[in-house]
Structure formats: structure tokens, C-alpha cells
């Protein structure tokens, strides 16, 4: 079973990693090709492309300039420890043991606009490039065109090493990022957990809570060494509970009320 996550825009390169073991991204050459194209943009063009402020545009202009084809612990950090958004607050990889991180290395993947597909311990240099960015490049009109079927083929290669019943992809990524995967080409069952909170008289997806819950689910899989999607239904972190009536074979719905 493999669980896929979205990356985070917020990054932490200040906190020293608690493990030294690291690996290198599979698609480093593709990332370098994108960086070469991004370096042609001015800060103003970056700001317009990404709809970000001038200071953020200048920051990322400099990040692209500083980016190196060679990633080392001196200029990069393990991806799961560098990402610092809502999902990663839920995952809280800094408190995972080395054994947990080794398990995550085999069972967790992060989709990335720049790197395509990352393992948790792959070295990540600072960047910003969301998958949905309409960045015209040598391969097409956007990043979905750039990555094509590469990410899907990479996932299939990993899924083929699993037992038949374990060929399950747990989609804990956002719609923007999972669009880079071609489910019809996957040699696996896809299960998507959905997290809803009670608000204004009904259950709804609240972005902040849902993102955090995806990270909590990934942590649950890692700490529990979970290999069966049915065991996902036992997830009960921070008040969420599986709702069988609202779920189906492909979508597992977890709900909670405030104060639960």
C-alpha cells in the first residue's frame, strides 16, 4: 500500500533534521530542466505567474538561481522534514522514529510540481512551484503536460513490487496534485479518504482541518504499519470516525463534530 500526499508551500530549513539518512529524488533531471526554464523569468513574471507578492516573487527568483543539480545536506533537507504546512503538522515527521521514517520511505510518496514524485527522505532544495501553475514549458502548456504519465509509471513500478492485495494507492493528496496521476493507468485500487467537520448544520470539508487530517492519516499508516485499506476505517485521530453510510468502496468518509 502506498499513500500519496501533496507538498507544502511553507518550508522549514531552520530546524536541524533528527536523522542523517537521505536519498536523492528520482526525477532530479526533470526538476533541473524545469529550473532552467524558470530561471528565464524575472521576479515580476514569477509574481504574475504564481499570483504571489513581490517579496515572495523575489525570494523564489533567488531560490531558482541558487538551486543546484547536486543536492547535499548542505543545500537541501529530507522532504518530509522540510515541508511545513497543515498536512505536515498532522504528520509531524520530526517526532517519528528512524524506524518509522524507514517505513514511510517505502510507503509514503509526495507529489511535487518541481520534483514530480518524492520519497520522504529525498533531499529537497527550497522551491515553490505548485502543480496547478500554468507554466508553459518545453513539454506543453502546464505542469500536467510536463509530467505526463511519468508520475503514474513511477507509482506503478513501485506498486508492482507489492503483493496483489497490497496494490492499493491511498489518495491523501489534493485534487490539484492528484490530477498529475492517471488513475485509469494505475495497476492498483485507489482509495480516497475524505474528512468532514460539522459546521452550520451539516458536514462539510473545511480545508485546514482536512489537510491536517490527511497528515494524521499518513502518520496512522506509518506508526501502525498498515497494509490493508480496511484497517484505515479504524482511524480515529482527533475525534474523526469512519462513517460507513456516507462511504463506498473507493471513498472512505470520516466525520467529526466540534468537541468530539
Curated annotation (Swiss-Prot):
It comes from the Bacteria. Belongs to the UPF0246 family. GO terms for cellular component: cytosol. Signal peptide: none annotated. InterPro entries: YaaA (IPR005583). HAMAP family: UPF0246. GO terms for biological process: response to hydroperoxide. Disulfide bonds: none annotated. Coiled coil: none annotated. This is UPF0246 protein BTH_I1090. The lineage of its organism: Bacteria, Pseudomonadati, Pseudomonadota, Betaproteobacteria, Burkholderiales.
Amino acid at each position: 500500500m502506498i499513500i500519496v500526499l501533496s507538498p507544502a508551500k511553507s518550508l522549514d530549513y531552520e530546524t536541524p533534521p533528527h536523522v542523517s539518512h537521505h536519498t536523492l529524488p528520482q526525477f532530479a533531471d526533470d526538476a533541473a530542466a524545469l529550473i532552467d526554464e524558470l530561471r528565464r523569468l524575472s521576479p515580476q513574471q514569477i509574481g504574475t505567474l504564481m499570483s504571489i507578492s513581490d517579496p515572495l516573487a523575489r525570494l523564489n527568483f533567488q531560490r531558482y538561481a541558487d538551486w543546484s543539480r547536486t543536492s547535499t545536506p548542505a543545500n537541501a533537507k529530507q522532504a518530509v522534514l522540510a515541508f511545513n504546512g497543515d498536512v505536515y503538522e498532522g504528520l509531524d515527521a520530526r517526532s517519528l522514529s528512524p524506524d518509522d521514517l524507514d517505513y514511510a520511505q517505502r510507503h509514503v510518496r509526495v507529489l511535487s510540481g518541481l520534483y514530480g514524485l518524492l520519497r520522504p527522505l529525498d533531499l529537497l532544495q527550497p522551491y515553490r512551484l505548485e502543480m496547478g501553475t500554468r507554466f508553459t514549458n518545453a513539454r506543453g502548456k502546464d505542469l500536467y503536460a510536463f509530467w505526463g504519465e511519468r508520475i503514474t509509471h513511477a507509482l506503478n513500478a513501485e506498486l508492482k513490487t507489492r503483493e496483489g492485495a497490497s496494490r492499493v494507492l491511498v489518495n491523501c493528496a489534493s485534487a490539484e496534485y492528484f490530477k498529475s496521476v492517471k488513475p485509469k493507468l494505475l495497476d492498483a485500487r485507489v482509495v480516497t479518504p475524505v474528512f468532514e467537520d460539522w459546521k452550520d448544520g451539516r458536514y462539510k470539508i473545511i480545508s485546514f482541518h482536512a489537510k491536517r487530517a490527511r497528515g494524521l492519516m499518513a502518520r496512522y499508516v506509518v506508526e501502525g504499519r498498515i497494509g490493508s485499506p480496511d484497517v484505515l476505517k479504524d482511524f480515529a485521530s482527533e475525534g474523526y470516525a469512519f462513517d460507513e453510510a456516507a462511504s463506498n468502496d473507493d471513498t472512505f468518509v470520516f466525520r467529526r463534530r466540534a468537541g468530539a
